UniProtKB/Swiss-Prot annotation:
Annotated positions binding substrate: 22-26, 71, 145, 199, 308
One GO location term (cellular component): cytosol
Annotated protein name in UniProt: Uroporphyrinogen decarboxylase
Domain of life: Archaea
Length: 331
């Protein structure tokens, strides 16, 4: 059995599984050649291309799982939001600031979702017969994009809306519904697991997380019937609370010591957490930290990953060496 599948289902495998967030990205010349001048949205209209881009890291790096190529903002277009991808990240043209009353914004329906993610997943599974992770943005992270119109520094605009705007619950409900339906679509297409990317969750206080967001996250998770990995950053103060969610693995960033994380997540699995910059700029030290991380996390219920996505400057050879090191750890 593939080590990723064995680990995420059973908590054990003969070798430690490894994959990387943003493993299909700009650091790969194969990705850049396939992408050319195409936009993310144009790529997401071509299911064969999505499947091929998603599989490239498996072939090149020898990772143990692929993740479907897409973007967390892509399903927002089915709600009526207009998205542009700019160098600094996606921008929502008709978000909260310009469209506070949510004019022409509707609930997610698959018939309104034009991107070929479902077809790409089907093609990937039929063509490559390899573990595939689907994904969605986390609730507060996706909300922050539509409220701020793009990345929301420190969640300032999002928290202001959360605390003072009567319409915030309308935004919560429509995004929660979208996340549930978009995950169902991917599960139905055949993904083996789901990762939720809640990169901005750490900007909430523990009390705000409990009082405003946790219940909605629990609703989302109750609708998922494949293994779930929950990724967030800056959440060391609530990691124990996150471990009580109905998830299988907690993916942590590089700022949390893995031994401490293991003591805080009860019996949940762990994923992470090498600093992406270390992986990019100092292979020798990256391998030392990788060893320290694995020793701290332990071999059971553990998936090796970075603490965030691969950065574009990362040498492919560095990641190959890291994968090989993890696979041969204590063999």
């Amino acid at each position: 059995m593939n080590s990723f599948i064995s680990m995420i289902r059973n908590g054990y495998s003969d070798t430690i599984p490894v994959w990387f967030m943003r493993q299909a990205g700009r650091y790969l010349k194969e990705y850049n050649e396939k992408k050319g001048r195409m936009t993310i949205k144009e790529i997401c209209m071509d299911p064969e291309l999505i499947a091929g881009i998603s599989y490239d890291p498996v072939r090149i790096l020898n990772v143990d799982a692929a993740i479907i190529f897409s973007d967390i903002t892509i399903p927002l277009e089915a709600l009526g939001y207009k998205i542009e991808f700019l160098p600094g990240g996606p921008r929502i043209i008709n978000g909260y600031i310009k469209n506070h009353d949510m004019k022409d914004i509707i609930y997610f329906e698959e018939s309104n979702f034009k991107y070929k993610i479902y077809d790409a997943i089907k093609i990937f599974k039929e063509k490559y017969h390899f573990p595939l992770i689907g994904f969605s943005g986390g609730l507060i992270t996706v909300l922050s994009y539509i409220i701020a119109g793009g990345p929301d520094s420190n969640l300032n605009l999002t928290k202001r809306s959360m605390l003072s705007d009567d319409k915030f619950n309308d935004y919560i409900n429509i995004i929660k519904d979208m996340i549930i339906k978009y995950i169902r679509l991917q599960v139905r297409a055949g993904v083996d697991a789901i990762q939720i990317f809640d990169s901005w969750l750490g900007y909430l206080s523990p009390q705000t997380y409990e009082n405003y967001i946790k219940g909605h996250i629990e609703e989302i998770l109750s609708e998922i019937n494949v293994p779930v990995i929950y990724f967030s950053t800056g959440t060391s103060s609530i990691i124990e609370k996150l471990s009580r969610l109905n998830v299988d693995y907690i993916s942590v960033d590089w700022r949390l010591d893995m031994k401490l994380a293991r003591s805080m997540v009860n019996k949940k699995g762990l994923q992470g957490n090498l600093d992406p910059l270390i992986a990019a700029y100092n292979l020798r030290y990256a391998l030392k930290e990788t060893s320290d991380i694995i020793n701290a996390a332990g071999r059971s219920s553990y998936i090796f990953n970075l603490g965030h996505g691969v950065i574009p400057e990362t040498p492919v050879e560095n990641l190959k060496h890291i994968v090989n090191f993890v696979h041969n750890f204590n063999q």
